[in-house]
Amino acid sequence: MYINLYKTYISRTVNNQGGVCMAKFTFRCHKLAAAICTAALLMPVSVQAKRLTILYVPLDNRPVCSAYVKQTMEAANCKIILPPEKYIATNEKNGNPEAIWDWLEHKAPKADAAVISTDSLVYGGLVGSRTHNVSQEELQKRVNHLYKLKTTLPIKLYAFSTIMRTPRASKGRVEPPYYSTIGPSIFAYSQLLDKQDQGKLSPAEKLTMQALERNMKKAELGDWLERREKNLLVNQELTRMARNGKFHYFAIGKDDNATLSATHMEGRKISLSTFDMSRDCFQILDGVDQLGLLLIARAYNEANGTKPSVYPLYSVGAGASTLPQYSDARLQDSVPQQIIAAGAVQAQSADNADLILALNTPQDGIVKDSTADDNQPFASAGNKNFVGILGQLLRSGRNVSLADISYSNGADNGFMSLLANSINLQPLAAYNGWNTADNAVGYAIAQGLIARDMSSEARSRLLRQRLIDDWFYQSNARRSISNELEKHNREDLKYDLATEEKNILQQITADCQSMANSYSITRGTKFTLSFPWKRLFEVDVEIKK
C-alpha cells in the first residue's frame, strides 16, 4: 500500500507551507542580519569571547556528535551542557525524548541558547529516524511539543533535522534488518523514483523499476517508504515552525546522499516550498554529523556579536567543482552554505579573511574511499604545490583550517605525510579529514572559527586528536585491520567487534602510536582509543597529554 501512497505523495509539489514568507518575519530576519553585520564591522573578530552556556541535544552519543563537540567548545571557554548519558541514543538503544524534554525545560533558565537535534526529540536519535515504527499521530504529538518549545524556553533555539539517508548498502544495526540484503535494490529503486518525479524516466527504466518492485518483498519496501513519508511530513511541519519564527535558526541536513536518490528528491521538495525563506533563518545542508558543532559555532558567533569571514582555498585541479561521495552538491555550492550556517560570511579574497579554509581535493575531481589502492604515502605534484602554499600561509601568521577531503572516510596519506614532514603544523587552526567531505568541511569551518578563542595548548590537543583519528586511524589502522579481517573471512567483526574487541583495540592502538611517533606534531602524545559503538567505523580518541 505504501509503495503507491509514497509515489502519489512525492509526486505533488510540496507547496503548502503558507505561501510567501510573512513580510513581518522576513523583515525581522533581514533586520537581524543587518544588525549582526554592523556589529561585525565595529568589533574585531579577535575580541575576547564572553563565557556562554549552551544546552546541546546531540543526535546520539558518537564522539563526533557529542564528546568532540563538547571538547571543542570548552577549549574556547564555552560551557556545553548535554542531557544525562542515559537519555541519549547509543548503538544499542534509542534516546528518551520525554526525559530530554523535561531536562531542557529544567536547564533552560540558566542557559544562553540551546542547540537541539529534532531527530532526538521526535524519533529518539539518528538511527531511530531510520528504523522507528512510531505512528503518525504520535509523531505529530511530538512535533506539537516542539512547537510549544519557543514559549516554554526563554532562550534562542537553534535546531537541526535530517532527511533520511539513502545508502547504496548498509550493514550492522543502523538500518532496518532487511537493508543488509536488499539495500542495493532499494537504492537503485530510489534513483528511478527520483527520475520519475522529475519526468525523466525512460520506458526501459520504467520496466526496470517495475522489476525491482517485483523482486523485493512488498512489506519491506513498503516499510521503508512509509517511514520516509512520515519523516518527510515531520520535516514539512518543522519548516513551517521555522517560517513562523519558532526557531532562531533551523537547518535540515541531507544524510548519505546522491544526485539521484530518495534523499535528493525529498530535499528538492522541501527546497521548492521554502525558496522564499531567508538563509539567516533556514537552510538545507549536505551532511548531518557535523551539524551539531556547526550550529553551536553559529550560536557562539552571534552571542559574541561577530560575523567572521571565511575564504575557501582549493588545491590545484577540479577544486570547487568536485562532487564528493555521499553528496548531491558540488563543493562550490555546499561549502558556502556551511559557511553561512556557522554564522560567518564568505570572503572574496584571502587577503583580509578571518579564516582561510584550505580544501585538499582530488586533482581529477574523483573522490574515492580512503581504502583505495592509490592512497599511499607518496605525494603527487599537486600535493607538493598545495603544501608549499599552506607553508607560506602558516609562516606568515594566517589563520588556516584544513579540510582534507581528497578521499572519503579518512586522510590523503601522500598529502599528509609531506605536509607533516615539511612544515610546522602547530599554528594550524584545525584539521579534519573524517567521514564524508561535508562532515569534514563543517567541522573544519566550526573548529577553525572557534580556534581564535583557544589557548595554543587547547588548540594543539584538538589538532592532534583529529590527526590521530582521521589520518592514523581512519586511513591506516582501520584499513589494515579491515584487510586482515577480510583475509580471514571475519568481515562480520567490522560491524560487531564482539569478543575480539580487546585484541583489535590493542592492534589499532599500536598502529596509531607507531604513526604518532613518526611525526613531530604528534610525537610524545599520550592517548587512548576506544570503540564507542563496538564497531570499526569510529573510535573515540582521548588525548591524555
Annotated model-derived regions:
Residues Y2, C29, T38-A39:
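Generic N-terminal initiation segments characterized by hydrophobic and/or small/turn-forming residues
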Residues A34-P44:
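Bacterial N-terminal signal peptides
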